[in-house]
Amino acid sequence: MKNTRGSTIGVILIISIFSVFATSCASFLHKKAKTKKIASVFYPPSPDTPHLQYLTSISGSDFVGKRTKFGTFILGAEDVSQMVKPYGLSFTNGKLYICDPGIGGLEIIDLKNNEYSNFTPGSNGQMKSPLNCYVDKNEFLYVADPGRHEVVLYDSVGNYIGKIADTGSFKPTDVAIYGDEIWVTNPDNHRLNVYDKHTKQFIRYFGEEFGPGDDGFLYSPYNLCITADVIYITDFGDFKIKKYDRAGKFLSSIGSYGTGVGQFVRPKGIACDKDGILYVVDAGFENAQMFNDKGQLLMFFGGPYKGPGDMWLPAKVVVDYDNLEYFKKYVDPKYNLNYLIIVSNQYGPDKINIYGSISPVKN
């Protein structure tokens, strides 16, 4: 996968990196959120040419203007207007789905209709520890719940429709769909489980051919990102991001344990853009690092929380190209918005940070 854009960014920014790196459903009726005017925050900062801009943050129902009745109808009413401890993210059809183990469910922000709701179903659909989620194009919801030892399934209106489980040790920590397959990370058995999307039947294990000491062995596979060509997996137990082809061949790894440039302390969520740039959030550094498809560090953004744009125990990152219209108003007028980078923070005042990949407006 050729990545000329990533290489260009790397040349421009690598000097800057070395100089600064060390340093469920119940809802509410709310007044329309007030837009906070803050100075534009760019990455890298001036005098370097910026490639990212911090746009805004979301921490609760005050970001949108009205409440849906869906959650009250389905779940009864426990009013929770603020996110507690958000983790996983999925963004589909103008709706941002946020796994929040702190409420035992999800927050759903419908930007198209300015609605905020808490999704905390009961009975067979009750969640214990919703960690990550995936929402398909039909708005069917898949929740990786290690507390239940299952991936829990819901239809587009929030009805519980089933589960994916394993007869062996099963602790699903992330879930993704690519084509007709459901991919699930399972740290308990050092591999991924792959299922048929339509039948929900088990197909195969991914990574089982490797043993301890092998480069491709997964000590604690926690998060994943699937592209047309490759699969990236966060191996939390080996402090690396591991790269495989779709057939399961190990290709390379990114990073190692340490506090230096391009290393990791607590690597968590990962995401890829269309040019092959890999985003990795690190709960230890409290930032996100960007790598090209050769594993070379390009830049980082965020940092321990001091103000807007910073992070506080970040957990997940997603890249989105389809919902730009809701955030263009935050972009500095000198720049165009290419796509969104969304990061969840488990602590601090800014729970969900929205960043934009930007490029200068051509005169």
Task: Name each region found by the language model.
Residues 25-363:
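Eukaryotic scaffold repeat domains enriched in small/polar residues
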Residues 2-12:
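Bacterial N-terminal signal peptides that target proteins for export
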Residues 12-20:
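Bacterial N-terminal signal peptides
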